[in-house]
Amino acid sequence: TKXXEAPAPKGLKGNEMLKGIFLEVKKKFETA
C-alpha cells in the first residue's frame, strides 16, 4: 500500500480538503 500511497499525497490531501469545504458549505445551505 505504501508504494500506491507515495505518489499521490498532494492530490489526495487537496481532494480531502475540497470535499470537506464542499460538505461544510452544503451543511450551511441545508440548515439555513
From Swiss-Prot:
Provide this UniProt record's keywords sorted from A to Z.
CF(0), Hydrogen ion transport, Ion transport, Membrane, Mitochondrion, Mitochondrion inner membrane, Transport
Subcellular location(s) per record: Mitochondrion; Mitochondrion inner membrane
Coiled-coil intervals, chain numbering: none
- Keyword tRNA processing tagged: no
Q: Which GO terms describe its cellular component?
A: mitochondrial inner membrane; proton-transporting ATP synthase complex
Transmembrane stretches, start-end: none
Q: Which GO terms describe its biological process?
A: proton transmembrane transport
- Record's function text: Mitochondrial membrane ATP synthase (F(1)F(0) ATP synthase or Complex V) produces ATP from ADP in the presence of a proton gradient across the membrane which is generated by electron transport complexes of the respiratory chain. F-type ATPases consist of two structural domains, F(1) - containing the extramembraneous catalytic core and F(0) - containing the membrane proton channel, linked together by a central stalk and a peripheral stalk. During catalysis, ATP synthesis in the catalytic domain of F(1) is coupled via a rotary mechanism of the central stalk subunits to proton translocation.
Name of the protein in its database record = ATP synthase 28 kDa subunit, mitochondrial
Q: From what organism does this protein derive?
A: Spinacia oleracea
